[in-house]
Amino acid sequence: MASSSNSYNSPCAACKFLRRKCMPGCIFAPYFPPEEPHKFANVHKIFGASNVTKLLNELLPHQREDAVNSLAYEAEARVRDPVYGCVGAISYLQRQVHRLQKELDAANADLAHYGLSTSAAGAPGNVVDLVFQPQPLPSQQLPPLNPVYRLSGASPVMNQMPRGTGGSYGTFLPWNNGHDQQGGNM
């Protein structure tokens, strides 16, 4: 959490970007190391240094790292897609889940159809028993989320998402019905 680079008098990315001296108690230093200048640049561009300072001062010290990582993710998403930001990524993933659920339902229907026809013919084994029924996992079985987000490597989800006109994911949003709306006609 604490930046070891301040011990060598290297300013944090925030102070370097803002062209000010990085003091020993700098609130940005633990979260914006000098090796990640784009992280602060994006956060500053979207939220502003003053607003981030106010936010960090209002939080408890153990909450600040998660807040900065969240701000950095949201800022990168907004820089990549000024219109939809994080909502574009969420909508894209929801549509992908919906499409895959339809594919799974179709495959299950095919399995059930073939299973019924082989059972009716008296074939040994019932294929219908093999139909996959997805079950939601109890919350205690979910894998832990990794709250650490590094801007040095781009988000895998955001890299897989196709880019539309102006970087928006308009063609993948549910309310567009597969038609990209050009020229801001919403």
Curated annotation (Swiss-Prot):
Q: Does the keyword Oxidoreductase apply?
A: no
Q: Which GO terms describe its biological process?
A: organ boundary specification between lateral organs and the meristem
Q: Any idea where the LOB domain is? A: 10-111
Outline the inducing conditions.
Answer: Positively regulated within the shoot apex by both ASYMMETRIC LEAVES 1 (AS1) and ASYMMETRIC LEAVES 2 (AS2/LBD6) and by KNAT1.
Q: What does UniProt note about where in the body, tissue by tissue, this protein is expressed? A: Expressed in a band of cells at the adaxial base of all lateral organs formed from the shoot apical meristem and at the base of lateral roots.
Q: Which GO terms describe its molecular function?
A: transcription cis-regulatory region binding
What keywords is this UniProt entry annotated with? Developmental protein
Q: Give the family per the record.
A: Belongs to the LOB domain-containing protein family.
What does this gene product do? Not known; ectopic expression of LOB leads to alterations in the size and shape of leaves and floral organs and causes male and female sterility.
- Name of protein: Protein LATERAL ORGAN BOUNDARIES
Gene coding for it: LOB
